């Protein structure tokens, strides 16, 4: 274990990283939870009133950007470190959520660019926290499991949207605008906690004893 990092510091970092991953890492992949309900609902029912074909095109386009994101955000991670990578990713997600919230079918149909921004930023969130495994040199497998597991848990976010719309009558604008605020809070966490250089761990040098 690197002596300069306390147990509290290491645990706090992995908890924050997993929280960010759950709330931002892979939310696009839970799209099926809202594609047949919230997104189809008319404005009077709290939805944007999108058609099946439009929703299909929207998520196909967003899926493309979710695969493009790691390439470009990975380059940012290599050049500028985890802090800049995470902040950039979170800003894409936040701006995408806000843009989705202010979009509407007749006047400002920007749903495709909005969801594409959310999809683009998601993978960068996970890329920016992978280095946290180095804080746990003796338990890297466990730390990696937490990170990958939290990414998969993010699939539930749109299901939560659907339940809030169905049972509590929150409209899509309130849901996405609120989530934009959550992403802005995540941006602040990234600014405060993530380092400019990834955490590293070097194996202790082997001691060679020569017998003469």
Task: Report the location of each language-model feature.
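Symmetry-related core transmembrane helices of the 12-TM Major Facilitator Superfamily/SLC fold
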Residues: 173-192
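Cytoplasmic membrane-interface "Motif A"-like loop-to-helix N-cap segments
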Residues: 78-90
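Hydrophobic core of transmembrane alpha-helices in multi-pass small-molecule transporters
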Residues: 108-125
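Central cavity-lining transmembrane alpha-helices of secondary-active solute carriers
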Residues: 57-75
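Long, low-complexity inter-transmembrane loops of multi-pass membrane transporters
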Residues: 194-212
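Cytosolic juxtamembrane N-terminal segment immediately preceding the first transmembrane helix
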Residues: 1-33, 49, 195-198
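C-terminal ends and interior cores of transmembrane alpha-helices
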Residues: 91-105
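Intracellular juxtamembrane helix-capping segments at the cytosolic ends
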Residues: 38, 122-146
């Amino acid at each position: 274990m690197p002596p300069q990092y306390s147990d509290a510091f290491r645990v706090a970092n992995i908890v924050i990283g997993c929280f960010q991953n759950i709330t931002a890492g892979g939310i696009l992949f839970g799209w099926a939870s809202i594609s047949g309900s919230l997104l189809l609902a008319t404005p009077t029912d709290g939805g944007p009133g999108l058609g099946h074909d439009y929703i299909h095109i929207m998520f196909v386009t967003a899926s493309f950007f979710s695969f493009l994101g790691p390439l470009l955000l990975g380059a940012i991670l290599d050049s500028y470190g985890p802090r800049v990578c995470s902040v950039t990713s979170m800003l894409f997600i936040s701006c995408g959520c806000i843009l989705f919230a202010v979009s509407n079918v007749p006047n400002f149909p920007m749903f495709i660019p909005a969801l594409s921004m959310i999809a683009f930023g998601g993978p960068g969130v996970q890329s920016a926290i992978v280095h946290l495994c180095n804080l746990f040199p003796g338990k890297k497998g466990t730390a990696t499991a937490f990170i990958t597991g939290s990414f998969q848990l993010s699939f539930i976010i749109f299901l939560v949207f659907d339940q809030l719309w169905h049972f509590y009558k929150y409209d899509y604008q309130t849901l996405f605008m609120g989530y934009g605020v959550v992403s802005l809070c995540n941006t602040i966490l990234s600014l405060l906690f993530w380092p400019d250089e990834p955490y590293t761990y070097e194996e202790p040098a082997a001691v060679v004893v020569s017998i003469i």
